[in-house]
Amino acid sequence: MLKIEHLKKSYENFSLDCSLEVKRGHVTGLIGQNGAGKSTTFKAILGLISYEHGDITILGKPLAQFTAKDKQDLGVVLSDSGFSGYLTINDILPIMENLYKNFDKSFFLEQVEKFQLPCDKKIKDFSTGMKAKVKVLTAISHHAKLLILDEPTAGLDVIARDELLELLRDFMTKEEGNSILISSHISSDLESICDDLYMIHQGTIILHEDTDVLLSDYALLKVDDEAYAGLDKQYLLRSKKESYGYSCLTNQKQYYAENYPQIAIEKGTIDEVITMMIRGAA
């Protein structure tokens, strides 16, 4: 559905070098700190910024050959864009009908009613959660095949985030083959919906893994200096010096559980995996 190969973009104090793939029928997450390169990647995918090197293929077509007609199959949410705050939902309806030949007005209005969004109130007067719902609803209401969502849950409370994620789950079950690329710095959001995750740091992908594998096979080993010295390190991804000795990140939890029953092994959260990949030593 989407493939990026060696995408390179340079700014004065930042360089992006990114490769990733979103498979058909998959939800793929891009997670990283603010400023890690998520938004730059998304803008390059959509042709909103130029880039120095790399290949981007969307729905089987090179980006350079992607037409306005092809864009009908994309649903997009960007963190710094959307409809004018001076428009109402009633104003948006004819715009959507003109933009997208497959705009499902009845579905859109059904969701508007479900979320109790006022149709005659200016969007600038909506709450943060209401604005986010409008963005996502416009992305999913024209039978897109691929959603590209940059931080759609940013700034939302737990309830609003859960409601948005439920919309995305429904999108994935609507039509076979639908796919999503979604970014966030909130790991729990991506953990609950993504099939696989890419972790980006300072413009570079530092880890790609299936979400199930991250949650089942990754772990933190907590060992003192003596235990660390005697540890088989072939399955350690990162190590970090601590006051008690070392914390070590592995993707082979079972190996260490079987061969080192005396050491402390903790299930690593995605946040802990990210922290270790960034701050730990290889």
What does each model-identified segment do?
Residues 72, 78-135:
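ABC-family P-loop ATPase nucleotide-binding domains
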Residues 147-151, 156:
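Catalytic Walker B motif of ABC-type/P-loop ATPase nucleotide-binding domains
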Residues 32-37:
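Walker A (P-loop) phosphate-binding loop of ABC-type ATPase nucleotide-binding domains
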Residues 236-282:
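C-terminal coupling/interaction segments
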